[in-house]
Structures are given as structure tokens and as C-alpha cells.
Amino acid sequence: MTAATFAPGFLWGVASAGHQNEGDNTASDTWFAEHVTPSVFQEPSGRACDGFTRWREDVGLAAGMGLNAYRFSVEWARVEPTPGVYDAAALDHYEAIVDECLARGLAPVVTYNHFTAPHWFAMRGSWLAAPSADRFASYCEVVTRRFGDRISHAVTLNEPNLPRLLSWLHLPGFVRDLERATLAAASEAAGVPS
């Protein structure tokens, strides 16, 4: 086996996604949609990998593998569970992850949005609503003010091309039907006309 040489500054790391890893993301749009019937989700995320409480282990594993970067997402629904109200404990939590990365020699790479958003944001029209960009920018600004000076890189939106890419797969009609049924059930449960 030969050793590869990477350019100085090359980031070799691992990544996690808030909703998929942290668990108990109860204020998010996805959590809400997981708990309606019918649902496109086969199984609710629940505690997921319990990454919200076990994050130090994740960071330690990344450092222990000799990597130099750890990408994680900041869950908007935790940071801003209600419009304009920012949760100091959630910000403390994500700031601690940044600081632990730095202490372990890992470049912290922060993703501001990894598919999920606050439930209140979805109730107000989600990304299609006129003020959505301003709402998202406000959240990003709060997070960046808190620890942006210590992150290596920022990813605004995780895989923004994915919906378009999935549309090319020509999924069977029942998948689209279930997706529409999930959205209708979520709208009904939330008291929003679909």
C-alpha cells in the first residue's frame, strides 16, 4: 500500500447531520412530519444516535482516527425554536462542539441547514415564503456572531441540489403519492389548509 500525499491544508474528515444524528429534534418540521399518519417516514428518528448528548464521543472518534476536520450541522429548530427567540443553551451546546474540535486538532466545519427547519418556519410557508431568506439569514447571523470566528468553513445549505437530483430518478408514483399524503396529514395536524 502506498501513502497518498495531500496538499497542505487539505481537510480529511467525517460529518454528521443534526436531525439524523442528534435525536429528539422535537421543534423541527421533519420531526412533526414523522409523527403524522400517513407518513413517508418508515420510522421516526426518535433519539437517533443520541448525538446531542454523545457528541464528545463523536469528536473523539474523529480525532482518534487521525482526521483533521469534523463537519456537523447546527439545528436551526434548536437554536430558534420560536420565531425571533434564540435558545442560549442550544448556542452553548454548539459552541462547545466547536471548542472541542479545536482542542482536539479538528477544523470545525459548520452546516447551517441540513434539510430540517423549525416547525414554525414550515407553518409560515417554509422556503417558498417571501421572508424565508431573511429569517434564515437572521439565524445564520446569530450563530456566526456566537462562534463564527472559530470555525474553519461554513456550509450554508447541505446538498441544495438533492430535490432536483431525486426528481430525475423517476420514483414510482406511490412514493410521490405518499409524500403528498404526508404533507396533507401534516397540514391537517397543524391546522393549516393544504
Task: Spell out what each predicted region is.
Residues 2-39, 63, 83, 92-194:
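Active-site region of glycoside hydrolase catalytic domains
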Residues 37-47:
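Acidic/histidine-rich helix-loop elements
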Residues 45, 52, 81-84, 126:
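Short, flexible active-site loop motifs that bind/organize anionic cofactors or intermediates
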Residues 49-53, 88, 130, 134:
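Conserved phosphate-coordination/catalytic loops
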Residues 50, 54-75, 107:
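Catalytic domains of carbohydrate-active enzymes, especially glycoside hydrolases
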Residues 74-88:
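Glycine-rich, proline-tolerant flexible connector loops at the mouths of alpha/beta enzymes
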